[in-house]
Amino acid sequence: MLKTQKDKKLENNFSNNNKTKKKKNIIVGLSGGVDSSLSAALLVESGWDVEGLTLWLMKGQGSCCSEGLVDAAGLCEDLGINHKIIDSREIFEREVIKKTTEGYEKGFTPLPCSMCNKNVKFEEMLNYAINKKDFTHIATGHYARIKKSSYAETLDYKSFVFKDFLLLRGTDENKDQSYFLYSLSQEVLSRLVFPLGEMKKEETRKEALRLGLRTAQKPESQDLCLVEHYGSMQRFIDKHIEPKEGEIIHVNGKVLGTHNGIHHFTIGQRKGLGIAWPEPLYVKSLDRVKNIVYVADKSDLFNREAIISKVNWVSIEEPKQEIEVEAQIRYRSHPVKGTLIPMKNSDNPANTFKLIFEESQSSVTPGQAAVFYKGEILLGGGLIN
């Protein structure tokens, strides 16, 4: 029988990791959404021995019986596979809630999804698979892809030393989630499968309907899990950080008003400042020590360079000299050309680099991730200082 385009896409996704053809046992992370549901269903349809795994992340009333957990359990029953729930509330509290709170207190704008991926989600899944012993792979519903290093040999990227496994953007440019995965290790990539990596979002909905999945018509979540749980990021912040009054000052030195905590602001913010000025003003910087919010005209928001710390090199060995990259400094932003220069010396910790943009960029925000690409290959990424 001739293979359909869908079959070829799935084959591409399922054949990039070693030993895939010999051992077919896999743990699938299930959130109760359509993407993770379809990932599990496609793996079952393709002949894998699948077990669903859902992480119980949130503390509080009703969180143990959330809609996501119920849908994930029901899906596994429909597919005839086992479903396991792991209580990950303590590690999520420590690695995501606490660190996100600390980031806001320091005047940063943290990226909770990356924290969760690095220290909770994939670690918990991998440890569970390893402890089960007979499970060799893990899978999620992320829109991203993994290739072996031989893929890079077809490209003219001679300035890089590639690792065994490469992380790539998802085929669907509008849904690509590789930005949030820059902290993954080679150990994780060697066992990881992304069933949706070659698919478009509209295809996933059609496939879910074709397979009759109970989540096929479920609306797509647009928010962080923290936002879904607390109602808004503002409520999360108010619950975890005490108000502290300070001044809002124009970069020319004029005091324009007061605020109740720098944790309520982010670089480039315009709305909600509560100040009067003839022209629109934006948050330029946050001074944690003096508890000051500095504002300026939009033209003052541009920066030509940034310091990137805690860089993790996903697909290549750490460069010892400057390299040319395409840098993405926000999830929904387009990558921009830049030069990355190592800063390893007595004044800077290891894995710290200076990123010089080819053209100045607006609202380069401390706490967010700067992720480096070469074409569709994610090279690595770190935190904007």
Curated annotation (Swiss-Prot):
Keywords: ATP-binding, Cytoplasm, Disulfide bond, Nucleotide-binding, RNA-binding, Transferase, tRNA processing, tRNA-binding. Residues 175-177, 330-331 are annotated as: Interaction with tRNA. Transmembrane segments: none annotated. CDD domains: MnmA_TRMU-like. The record marks H142, Q368 as: Interaction with tRNA. It catalyses: S-sulfanyl-L-cysteinyl-[protein] + uridine(34) in tRNA + AH2 + ATP = 2-thiouridine(34) in tRNA + L-cysteinyl-[protein] + A + AMP + diphosphate + H(+). It is found in: Cytoplasm. The lineage of its organism: Bacteria, Bacillati, Cyanobacteriota, Cyanophyceae, Synechococcales. One of its GO terms (molecular function) is ATP binding. This is tRNA-specific 2-thiouridylase MnmA. It comes from Prochlorococcus marinus (strain MIT 9312). Its main location: cytoplasm. It is an enzyme of class 2 (transferase). Catalyzes the 2-thiolation of uridine at the wobble position (U34) of tRNA, leading to the formation of s(2)U34. GO terms for cellular component: cytoplasm. Disulfide bonds join C116-C225. The active site is at C116 (nucleophile), C225 (cysteine persulfide intermediate). One of its GO terms (biological process) is tRNA wobble position uridine thiolation. Its EC number is 2.8.1.13. Belongs to the MnmA/TRMU family. ATP binds at G29, L30, S31, G32, G33, V34, D35, S36, L55, G141. Gene3D superfamilies: Adenine nucleotide alpha hydrolases-like domains, HUPs, Translation factors. InterPro entries: MnmA-like (IPR004506), MnmA-like_C (IPR046885), MnmA-like_central (IPR046884), MnmA-like_central_sf (IPR023382), Rossmann-like_a/b/a_fold (IPR014729).
